[in-house]
Amino acid sequence: MHMPDRLPAIAFLISALIFAACEKEITIKPNEGNDLIVVEGHIEPDLPPYVILTRSQTFFSETDITSLSHIFVQGATVMVSDGQRTVTLTELASNNLPASLLDSISRMIGLPLASVSNPGGLKAVIYTTSELTGQPGGRYTLSVEADEQHLSAVTTIPDRIVLDSVWTIPHPATDTLRTLMVRYTDPASEENYVRYFTSVNSRPFFPPYFTSVLDEKTYFNTSGKTVDIPLEKGYNRYDNDIDFSVYSYFAASDTIVLRWCSIDKDHFRFWSTAEFNRNSGGNPFSNPTHISSNIKGGLGIWGGYNPGYYIILPESD
């Protein structure tokens, strides 16, 4: 197993961002004419922070070019501090972004590339900087001023959780499908939280369709023992061709890359509650709901990742 070649930094992280401090649970009631701002921001070791700001009515909702015409918040002041210095992020528009990033955006929101890149299409906006990168163990404060609203959040980049091994096992009824397995030895007296993504045959990384996070209580509370965990295949949720009878399996011929990310508790709780609501058929930011967020003054997540990468090659004949 080894780390694959990296995609361009922005393109790599936006796969997690679009499909996508103090912890709090909030009840959201739609406010007509004054949408709350949703933060989708992340930082990881050796890469700069990336922040996408959208408006609450569209988060996790069905999308087309009309409903997304004003999804991105422009003209915001976005700052990140690592405790030593504070930097202001630069706003980048889709017409100034590389083709690799535009392709990632179109895949994540389920719209054709032409809808994102054409002059009359969607105007995507992302905030980033080359002046600051994440570090393991770092603590990062986000501050946003936009639409006469002030938002703030704090996240950390936990130590990396290293897997003992990664492999596949055959489907019980056919040798053309396989289940991805990981083995993990839990350090005693440590709380661990993970979000994972998979890439198949060099395609973009996607989280599992239903649940992308694993928590201390469910999987890792083993007091130093070793546990084997089956993982599900990642999907673009806007893919209309998913066969749910076998959705969790990989083809035996697939080359799989697992992106296994350590996250902190606040980050875990956001995805856990947001995915639960989404899987129940709701839109957590357009209907009254309980959802955990570390964003003060807004919605969404400012989260640190510490990823490890594992390659699983097809079974030899």
What are these regions (language model features)?
Residues H2-I10:
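Bacterial N-terminal signal peptides that target proteins for export
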Residues I18-A21:
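C-terminal motif of bacterial Sec signal peptides marking the signal peptidase cleavage site
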